[in-house]
Amino acid sequence: MLIGSHVSMSGKKMLQGSAEEAHKYGESTFMIYTGAPQNTRRKNIEDLNIEKGQQAMKTYGLSNIVVHAPYIINIANTTKPEVFNLGVDFLQKEIERTQALGAKDIVLHPGAHVGAGVDKGIQKIIEGLNEVLTHDNDVRIALETMAGKGTEVGRSFEEIAQIIDGVTHNDRLSVCFDTCHTHDAGYNVKEDFDGVLEKFDSIIGVDRIKVVHVNDSKNLRGAQKDRHENIGFGHIGFDALNYVVHHDTFKNIPKILETPYVGEDKKNKKPPYKLEIDMLKSQKFDPELKNKILTQ
């Protein structure tokens, strides 16, 4: 099963450290940010320790890794040209880093229209992607399904389809299907996942899905909040998420957990990924999971 989580990439080890962390959690794939998601400070490609990282990946049987673009990129911004231009320039550099790391997809939040309206936001996203996707490489931008918080674009399959349809080189666009976001946007992931997939297929095409973010939700369906919960402890529930993870459609697609660290003490929170992945592999919910994470 191709399953992993978000892991860190930092210090001198960089990609090698990411591979070691993923191996510690029993993963077969993983997702990384090339630096802090909240800023544009990045190391040079030659400082990412790629060769040793890829050797470690081979040793540990890790493949199909995914890069996530930082949150600060907002190519839907119609009011501040400097924000749009920063997003376009930085996204292009992130694509170069993604290619150097050997990843095929970089996940991107489509952006927020900051009050100009969805249609104007979508047109701006299309403009930005058309600038970025003229360069010659084979990295795909995976547009993430969003929860609809604030002025986010991409809360419906139709909005994502509109973006894809408007982009010239849209063979370089894929989709990252996030279970929490889709649930929070109002789709019935919990009780009718096949129905949700059928709708997605009719509007976008399931062959576009190249990454799945596997997250439970702290919120009721349709809340448009985007607050992740540990697997089985939220409003989607273990059975539905287990069904998603083992779905034939996603057999060869990286499934990435972005569930919250566990613990009340902010300085001593524990990563949940090893035990969550073990639980999904066994296909049996463990109500004591959070306590076990704290004592591991």
UniProtKB/Swiss-Prot annotation:
InterPro entries: AP_endonuc_2, AP_endonuc_F2_Zn_BS, Xyl_isomerase-like_sf, Xyl_isomerase-like_TIM-brl. Its EC number is 3.1.21.2. The keyword Ribosomal protein does not apply. Disulfide bonds: none annotated. HAMAP family: Nfo. Endonuclease IV plays a role in DNA repair. It cleaves phosphodiester bonds at apurinic or apyrimidinic (AP) sites, generating a 3'-hydroxyl group and a 5'-terminal sugar phosphate. This is Probable endonuclease 4. It comes from Staphylococcus epidermidis (strain ATCC 35984 / DSM 28319 / BCRC 17069 / CCUG 31568 / BM 3577 / RP62A). The gene is nfo.
